[in-house]
């Protein structure tokens, strides 16, 4: 039986996300899922092949409905072999398509993270103190709004190694200063551009909606500016602090499926993400506009 209990002591998908861009022999991509299949259903089915330590099903950010695919992490790699040895897998009346999760080739282990939902009132010293508890920090970037010359509601933290990033990603949200912040791996802008080029060939993604009223109070202002920044460049950052993945084209969360026809499952919903085009990193080394912009994914 699985060790994946009803109330796990980690966030769903956190153990899967902790090793993004790295080959993990116990990790699988599961395609062709019925919209009615739940995480529990998928976990129970795959548990017959070995102990499942993490499982996540991706959902549409607008409707909350399953997008028909997910990821699973087995405790032992031999379980993956057992799954693949079985010619046919049927769950909730549908043939499902399990595959090894293949990490994108040529990508270095992540050392830089994006911190979203950060109050501009949080001092640099507070940021150093919190993130320094996970490992040695190489650099902290605090983007400024070029129009107001005020801090934006997010920052970037670069470590000297990859281990601190793994530790951070074990939890999706972190309490930093007075707010609850979301942590994501920062991705080079050129990678995002490549994804956008692929997306344009397959059609446009979800429409960009505009957020609520334009409040000017400092308490709401920074948070709203952060949400607007996401709406325009990255995706939807809900009022409840949750971020919903927007979609992917031939690659997902650091995994390469370029030879796989996701269109048959209706997965190709496009990427929308943060590009950093409006920000200058006053704290970045060298000053001025930061040439190697990053965005989370």
UniProtKB/Swiss-Prot annotation:
InterPro entries: hnRPDL_RRM1, Nucleotide-bd_a/b_plait_sf, RBD_domain_sf, RRM_dom. CDD domains: RRM1_hnRPDL (cd12758), RRM2_hnRPDL (cd12585). It is found in: Nucleus; Cytoplasm. Pfam families: RRM_1. Residues 1-21, 192-224 are annotated as: Disordered. Keywords: Cytoplasm, DNA-binding, Methylation, Nucleus, Repeat, RNA-binding, Transcription, Transcription regulation. GO terms for molecular function: DNA binding; RNA binding. The keyword RNA-binding applies. It comes from the Eukaryota. Acts as a transcriptional regulator. Binds DNA and RNA. This is Heterogeneous nuclear ribonucleoprotein D-like. It comes from Xenopus tropicalis (Western clawed frog). The gene is hnrnpdl.
């Amino acid at each position: 039986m699985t060790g994946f209990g009803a109330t796990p002591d980690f966030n769903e998908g956190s153990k899967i996300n902790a090793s993004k861009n790295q080959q993990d022999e116990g990790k699988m991509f599961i395609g062709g899922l019925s919209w009615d299949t739940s995480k529990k259903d998928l976990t129970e089915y795959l548990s017959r092949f070995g102990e499942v330590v993490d499982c996540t099903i991706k959902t549409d950010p607008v409707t909350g409905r399953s997008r028909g695919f997910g990821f699973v992490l087995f405790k032992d790699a031999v379980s993956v072999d057992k799954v693949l040895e079985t010619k046919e897998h049927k769950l909730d009346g549908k043939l499902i398509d399990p595959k090894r999760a293949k990490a994108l080739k040529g990508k270095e282990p992540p050392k830089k993270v994006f911190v979203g939902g950060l109050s501009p009132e949080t001092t640099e010293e507070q940021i150093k103190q919190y993130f320094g508890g996970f490992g040695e920090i190489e650099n902290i970037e605090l983007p400024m709004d070029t129009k107001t010359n005020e801090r934006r509601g997010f920052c970037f933290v670069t470590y000297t190694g990859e281990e601190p990033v793994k530790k951070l990603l074990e939890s999706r949200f972190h309490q930093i200063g007075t707010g609850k912040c979301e942590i994501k791996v920062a991705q080079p802008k050129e990678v995002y551009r490549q994804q956008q080029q692929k997306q344009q060939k397959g059609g446009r993604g979800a429409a960009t909606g505009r957020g609520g009223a334009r409040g000017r109070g400092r308490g709401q202002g920074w948070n709203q500016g952060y949400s607007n920044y996401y709406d325009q460049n990255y995706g939807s950052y809900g009022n409840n602090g949750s971020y919903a993945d927007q979609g992917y084209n031939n690659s997902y969360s650091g995994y390469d499926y370029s030879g796989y026809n996701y269109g048959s499952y209706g997965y190709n919903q496009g990427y929308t993400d943060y590009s950093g085009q409006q920000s200058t990193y006053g704290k970045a080394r060298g000053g001025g506009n930061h040439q190697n912009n990053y965005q989370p994914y």
